[in-house]
Regions:
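Conserved, charged catalytic cores of large soluble enzymes
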Residues: 1, 103, 107-126
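Second-shell residues forming the walls of enzyme active-site clefts
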Residues: 1-76, 81-83, 89, 94-97, ...
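Residue-level detector of family-conserved "landmark" positions at structurally sensitive sites
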Residues: 8, 40, 76, 97-98, ...
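Short coil/turn segments at secondary-structure boundaries
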Residues: 9, 78, 100-101, 116-123, ...
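Short linear capping/connector segments at secondary-structure termini
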Residues: 9-11, 46, 84, 119-128, ...
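C-terminal non-catalytic regions of proteins with extracellular/luminal or membrane-system context
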Residues: 15-17, 34, 50, 81-95, ...
């Protein structure tokens, strides 16, 4: 019963990194609170104390203090092993403390029955279950319920009759992998799925419209803008511990050709759907930005499409596909920034937020816009 494992964060409390906080881990957690489980560091906590936080002079002292504080499992610090051995040989670390950590790991495995049944991955079950129809149906239902229609001046639902033309525009309108969000196989933290999840299992917003509209209703696509360019980290190819540094995402340069193509497509259409937001290089662990503004050419794209909507009277639906709060331009939310205001923003008829809706997210978004699902 209860929690079997705690993972320790990178943060410091009162100047003491959590990984080395003996009072918190041993005196309070294991002592006063009688915690019987194991403690595991986050990715390279011990190593980062040497090469990033610079609170430990070397791996020998870092390993010593990590074990003394009460850590059991040291995640992804290759130098910990030699550092701990050197600490024992130099009299800095009592070997009995290592024995205690090992005993807690073994005790957890015994409680879970892993020595009798290691519960290794079942390849046949993996192929049969992961991405199964039940999984896809569940994701679709969750996506339908998670998408929020923040503003609608009456443009939705849109009636996609055979004589209509729909322009689906934006850098995320047909971006299968970024629709899934962080930690989904090609997030930058791992390289075992460099091409991401299987494309044929993902329904983008563009896919969703093409699947749902009746025969004769034309759906066209323009990228319209780029979000980021990936560049080498100026700090070098590898971290000081030898692990590779991922590329850094910087705001993409404005591309007039992409914008012109999108505007031309929008002018000829009866409905304009703009899908904007962020990508995995801008969110999650090790990735943050100094602004919540849309990056790259996205604001310019939205303003141009809003102008088309004003000139032609055609509805513009803006979809924010993002896993964090973002600052939207006035053409989407109005000059007062109050999206629940009854008056329409200048050029935008409807605005919806889809927080990384997953493999069937594009279908859910298209269903809501076309009136097949209640938001």
């Amino acid at each position: 019963e209860g929690c079997g494992t705690f993972m320790l964060g990178y943060e410091s409390i009162d100047g003491a990194p959590v990984t080395f906080n003996k009072w918190l881990l041993s005196d309070k957690l294991r002592g006063d609170w009688n915690y019987q489980g194991t403690l595991i560091t986050d990715w390279d906590n011990v190593g980062r104390s040497v090469w990033e936080q610079k609170v430990k002079p070397d791996y020998m002292h870092a390993a010593t203090d990590a074990v003394k504080a009460g850590n059991d499992l040291i995640m992804t610090t290759p130098q910990f092993f030699d550092g701990a051995i050197k600490a024992v040989r130099n009299g800095l670390l009592d070997e009995s403390l290592i024995d205690e950590a090992v005993s807690r790991i073994l005790a957890l495995k015994f409680r879970l029955g892993l020595f009798e049944d290691p519960r290794l991955p079942d390849e046949k079950r993996i192929k049969a279950v992961i991405g199964s129809k039940d999984h896809q149906d569940l994701n679709l239902q969750i996506a339908r319920e998670s998408v929020a229609l923040l503003k609608n001046n009456g443009a939705l639902p849109f009636s996609a009759t055979p004589d209509k033309r729909i322009a689906v525009i934006g850098p995320l309108a047909d971006d299968a992998q970024n629709q899934l969000g962080d930690w989904t196989g090609n997030s930058g933290q791992v390289n075992w799925m460099p091409d991401g999840q299987p494309r044929d299992m993902i329904t983008t917003v563009l896919d969703g419209f093409r699947q749902l509209v009746p025969e004769g209703c034309e759906v066209v696509y323009s990228r319209g803008a780029d979000i980021i360019d990936l560049v080498d980290d100026p700090e070098g190819e590898c971290y000081p511990d030898g692990q590779p540094r991922p590329k850094i995402g910087v705001s993409a340069r404005f591309d007039q050709r992409l914008l012109d193509e999108a505007v031309a497509n929008a002018r000829q259409s009866d409905l304009i759907v703009a899908v904007v937001g962020d990508v995995v290089q801008l969110v999650g662990e090790t990735c943050s930005t100094a602004t919540l503004e849309l990056l790259g050419g996205q604001n310019a794209l939205l303003e141009a499409l809003a102008n088309v909507a004003k000139e032609t009277g055609k509805p513009l639906v803006v979809v924010l596909l993002s896993s964090k709060p973002q600052v939207m331009p006035a053409c989407v939310i109005g000059t007062n920034g109050v999206i629940v205001d009854e008056s329409a923003a200048d050029g935008t008829s409807a605005f919806m937020w889809a927080p990384n809706p997953g493999m069937k997210g594009g279908q859910a978004i298209a269903e809501i816009i076309l009136g097949k699902t209640e938001p």
